[in-house]
C-alpha cells in the first residue's frame, strides 16, 4: 500500500534543508545520508548524494528520471555471491 496523497511524499527534513542550502550557494559537494526512505524531489537533481547501504556509502548522481523514487532503491544492501557450486573436494571425488 502506498503513502496517502493527502500526506505527500516523505522527505527527510535535514536532507531537504541541506539540498536547499546547496542550491542557493551553487555548491556541488557530496552529501552523506542514512535516510534511505526519503523520496527524491526535483531539488535534488544535479547533486551527488552518498547513500548508506548498511556498510558503506554509495555516491549516486541524481538525475531527472530518479525524481519520485526513494534513495534506498539506488544503493543495494545485499550482495548475491551465487548459488553453491561444486567445491574442490567435491570435484576431486567425481
Curated annotation (Swiss-Prot):
Gene Ontology CC: cytoplasm; small ribosomal subunit
Keyword set includes Ribosomal protein: yes
Keywords: Ribonucleoprotein, Ribosomal protein, RNA-binding, rRNA-binding
InterPro entries: Ribosomal_uS19, Ribosomal_uS19_bac-type, Ribosomal_uS19_CS, Ribosomal_uS19_SF
Gene3D superfamilies the UniProt entry points to: 30s Ribosomal Protein S19, Chain A
Any one GO MF annotation of this record: rRNA binding
One of the Pfam families matching this protein, by short name: Ribosomal_S19
Keyword NADP belongs to the record: no
GO biological process: ribosomal small subunit assembly; translation
Entry's family note: Belongs to the universal ribosomal protein uS19 family.
HAMAP family, A to Z: Ribosomal_uS19 (MF_00531)
Function (record text): Protein S19 forms a complex with S13 that binds strongly to the 16S ribosomal RNA.
Protein name according to UniProt: Small ribosomal subunit protein uS19
Source species taxonomy: Bacteria, Pseudomonadati, Elusimicrobiota, Endomicrobiia, Endomicrobiales
Amino acid at each position: 500500500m502506498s503513502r496517502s496523497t493527502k500526506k505527500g511524499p516523505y522527505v527527510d527534513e535535514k536532507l531537504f534543508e541541506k539540498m536547499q542550502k546547496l542550491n542557493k550557494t551553487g555548491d556541488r559537494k557530496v552529501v552523506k545520508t542514512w535516510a534511505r526512505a526519503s523520496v527524491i524531489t526535483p531539488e535534488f537533481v544535479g547533486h551527488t548524494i552518498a547513500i548508506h547501504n548498511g556498510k558503506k556509502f554509495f555516491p549516486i548522481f541524481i538525475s531527472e528520471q530518479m525524481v519520485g523514487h526513494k534513495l534506498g532503491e539506488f544503493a543495494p544492501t545485499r550482495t548475491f555471491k551465487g548459488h553453491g557450486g561444486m567445491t574442490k573436494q567435491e570435484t576431486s571425488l567425481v
